[in-house]
């Protein structure tokens, strides 16, 4: 019991003492159905609408650069940068999901506006991530070939409640389940109102 507690405290201390984790690359080759992106998102705040950001080194030791260009005019720009790499042998069909700001998760005084928190998206590579329809979320579909890298820069209008990376099949299955549940609730509500 004491050994478990000591190892738990050691994990907490090591987790707090490693600020470089946010600038690491996320390997999606052996990923499960979903993963929380919070530890892998590099945060950048700047007053310039256009900025070049250095990315983490790839497997060959090269350092890449991503160009971030804002789509709006504000006093300061908030970006979240994510680098994905596929070390697996098969292409990965992935969905990056950022929850919308909801009124319930807002502040008491001067509440935040509900809705999308992603103003624009920048990427490396030739194929832009496609925006897909998702209820209460900003979702972007991308395919990562074997041995490929992809970096995304998300311009944020506020703090994202959560950000997840999903495999496409798992995301579609969850979306269908939620749609069925919402339909069942709506059907019961209609029957009760009659």
What is each model feature region?
Residues 23-178:
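Soluble non-transmembrane domains of integral membrane proteins
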Residues 175-194:
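Core alpha-helical transmembrane segments of integral membrane proteins
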Residues 1-5:
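Positively charged n-region of N-terminal signal peptides that target proteins for export
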Residues 11, 149, 183-185:
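Small-residue packing motifs within transmembrane alpha-helices
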């Amino acid at each position: 019991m004491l050994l478990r507690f000591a190892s738990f405290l050691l994990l907490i201390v090591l987790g707090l003492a490693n600020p470089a984790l946010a600038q690491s690359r996320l390997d999606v080759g052996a990923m499960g159905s979903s993963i929380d992106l919070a530890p892998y998102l590099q945060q950048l705040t700047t007053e310039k609408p256009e900025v070049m950001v250095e990315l983490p080194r790839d497997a060959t030791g090269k350092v890449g650069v991503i160009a971030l260009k804002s789509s709006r005019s504000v006093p300061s720009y908030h970006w979240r940068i994510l680098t994905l790499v596929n070390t697996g042998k098969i292409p990965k069909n992935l969905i990056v999901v950022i929850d919308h700001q909801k009124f319930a998760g807002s502040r008491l005084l001067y509440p935040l506006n509900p809705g999308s928190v992603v103003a624009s998206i920048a990427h490396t590579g030739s194929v832009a991530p496609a925006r897909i329809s998702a209820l209460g979320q900003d979702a972007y579909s991308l395919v990562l070939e074997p041995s490929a890298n992809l970096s995304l820069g998300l311009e944020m209008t506020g703090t994202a409640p959560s950000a997840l990376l999903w495999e496409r099949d798992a995301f579609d299955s969850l979306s269908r389940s939620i749609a069925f549940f919402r339909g069942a609730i709506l059907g019961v509500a209609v029957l009760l109102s009659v």
